[in-house]
């Protein structure tokens, strides 16, 4: 239930005070789960200033919705305090003096300009349906008009980057604080451990096997999108209106557009993906029947090793031929990883870069769960890093 602004407006300072009061007044036997402990909390003692005990309780319930659902009350209160302090540092950086405003993409410019006109034309239409109409109108724009939006975006983007560089020079203290608060120590330690583990695993492999991460067999059917979001992502990625964006900006924009389209359109993409999956299974079964027993065993071995960052043992097969590592898809991946999503081992050259996959997917959580369930039954091998090799059968 939303509180009135006069009673329910909480500043970050007020939230920190609430968490401190909770920490000081929590039950002494705080050994149970946080939900059990908070039910025995005396919220009258937590009350402060103009915030009653009931208001404090409701605010804590709102805060705890964004926290993990296990642990003691003390642990969750400490976690919430860290989040608020981190938010304060980030806001100081973003709201600092003269911080430049990020420019709108070409599509968002058209969307912002056209929204008032179309909302008057269709006063009773829902926002989702109106967004769908505007998306269609943008796709139907003449190339000359579309280029105007793209050029305006590029011009403002260049100005933004210049202003941002000046801002960082003039306010190095704010930049340094924002960098320190962007990644928690826990995350840093987790990434470092995973990085060291990957180094040890790769170094333990024979040199000939180290960087053959994906094996693709000649004639093997291409794996289709696993769900509706993947199909939408695939269709949007190569569209003309996305070509002027960088890899990172393109991923963000596709994620935003997915959130805007109506459920009926999402269901349509889902149906397309399911149909492609059925066709893929039929093609895969037919292709597997054409393999010799030796090649079939090699294929099963390679798919079994998928996802474990392991190469096929016994050195390179003379039947294997190396695919071009500088393909357009490989370049796109390298560009995406190059923006802070990979780590390179000290003392190795660029051909022996060991990537630690720590990026956040733009894909909704429910789709990622479905992907993990389908991954067990999938016989296709995804490229995580390194080179691709192809088998002639």
Swiss-Prot record:
Keywords: Cytoplasm, Developmental protein, DNA-binding, Nucleus, Repeat
Segments of the chain annotated as binding DNA: 100-168, 222-288
Region (Disordered): 308-393
A Pfam family: HMG_box
Protein's name according to its UniProt entry: Upstream-binding factor 1-like protein 1
Function as written in the Swiss-Prot or TrEMBL entry: Essential for proliferation of the inner cell mass and trophectodermal cells in peri-implantation development.
Primary subcellular site in the record, as a coarse category: cytoplasm
Organism: Homo sapiens (Human)
């Amino acid at each position: 239930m939303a509180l009135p602004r006069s009673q329910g407006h909480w500043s970050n300072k007020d939230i920190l005070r609430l968490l401190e009061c909770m920490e000081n007044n929590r039950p002494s036997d705080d050994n149970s789960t946080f939900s059990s402990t908070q039910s025995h909390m005396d919220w009258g003692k937590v009350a402060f200033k103009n915030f009653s005990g009931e208001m404090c309780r409701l605010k804590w319930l709102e805060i705890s919705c964004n926290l993990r659902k296990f642990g003691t009350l003390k642990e969750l209160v400490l976690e919430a305090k860290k989040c608020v302090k981190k938010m304060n540092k980030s806001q100081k950086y973003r709201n600092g003096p003269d911080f430049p405003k990020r420019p709108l993409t070409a599509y968002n410019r058209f969307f912002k300009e056209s929204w008032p006109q179309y909302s008057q034309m269709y006063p009773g239409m829902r926002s989702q349906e109106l967004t769908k109409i505007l998306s269609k109108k943008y796709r139907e724009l003449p190339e000359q008009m579309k280029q105007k939006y793209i050029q305006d975006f590029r011009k403002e983007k260049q100005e933004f980057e210049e202003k941002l560089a000046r801002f960082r020079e003039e306010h190095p203290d704010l930049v340094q604080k924002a960098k320190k608060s962007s990644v928690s120590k826990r995350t840093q330690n987790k990434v470092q451990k995973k990085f060291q583990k990957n180094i040890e695993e790769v170094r333990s492999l024979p040199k000939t096997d180290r960087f053959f991460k994906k094996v693709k067999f000649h004639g093997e059917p291409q794996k289709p999108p696993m769900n509706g979001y993947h199909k939408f992502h695939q269709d949007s990625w190569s569209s003309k209106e996305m070509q002027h964006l960088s890899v990172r900006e393109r991923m963000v924009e596709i994620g935003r557009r997915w959130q805007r389209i109506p459920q009926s359109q999402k269901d349509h993409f889902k149906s397309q993906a399911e149909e492609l999956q059925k066709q893929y299974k039929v093609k895969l079964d037919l292709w597997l029947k054409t393999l010799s027993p030796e090649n079939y065993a090699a294929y099963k071995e390679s798919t079994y090793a998928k996802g474990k960052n392991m190469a096929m043992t016994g050195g390179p097969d003379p039947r294997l031929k190396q695919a071009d590592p500088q393909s357009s898809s490989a370049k796109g991946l390298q560009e995406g990883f190059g923006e802070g999503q990979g780590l390179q081992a000290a003392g190795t050259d660029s051909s022996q870069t060991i990537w630690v996959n720590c990026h956040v997917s733009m894909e909704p959580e429910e789709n990622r769960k479905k992907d993990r369930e389908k991954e067990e039954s999938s016989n296709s091998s995804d490229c995580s890093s390194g080179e691709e090799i192809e088998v002639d059968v």
